[in-house]
């Protein structure tokens, strides 16, 4: 069995491959607990696309860990082990950890997208990272790149479990007022995904962003695209207009 450094190298080679998505089952053949360390490390990779693919692999791996059948569980497997990994994510976003937590919000969001039970348990704390202190739990992140990651994570969560974000529409509406353009754009993207849940209150605020030319890097459908706040606002409005009950 490969040592940790060798395993990280093997995982990175897979994620850097153009056919990486088709090769993800190769990672499924390995114990999930052994992949967590290498994947945490690869969230810091110099190559942006490798970092995003590490996010995808991280969520897939933790969800697999949570769903491992009792007969196949060893140390570090099962739902509680997956919870421990997500608590590690929360720790890495804590100032007391001494780190910055690059890529951690995205990895957390990808995991919640892939596992309903974990999403039910952790979605509120995820949203709390962009709630302003006066209406949150004191978790609000000041570092702009991390806030971008949280807004992306909320959008990813909304793709699978929009009902869990019904109470977060005010949080997202506040996100449309962020000073950072990428935060505004990612929030607009998320509100569009929520559809009817956000339609009544979000449409006017989104319309106000149609001329916003600030650039946004958005990872979706396995690819990184460069777009603008205005484009994402228009896309969101189109989705809201087509929402049932609208």
Spans of features found by a protein language model:
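Structural signature of alpha-helical solenoid repeat scaffolds
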Residues: 59, 63, 109-110, 151, ...
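Short coil/turn segments at helix-helix junctions and helix-capping linkers
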Residues: 41-49, 91, 95-99, 174-182
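Long, ordered, amphipathic alpha-helical scaffolds
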Residues: 188-246
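Histidine/lysine/aspartate-rich catalytic loop segments that bind and position anionic ligands
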Residues: 125-161
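Amphipathic alpha-helical scaffolding segments comprising HEAT/armadillo-like alpha-solenoid repeats
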Residues: 2-8, 30-42, 67-90, 116-133, ...
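N-terminal alpha-helical scaffold/docking segments in eukaryotic complex subunits
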Residues: 1-56, 60-74, 227-244
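Alpha-helix N-cap/helix-start positions at coil->helix boundaries
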Residues: 17, 33, 48-52, 98-99, ...
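Alpha-helical solenoid repeats of the armadillo/HEAT superfamily
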Residues: 102-105, 142-151, 183-186, 226-234
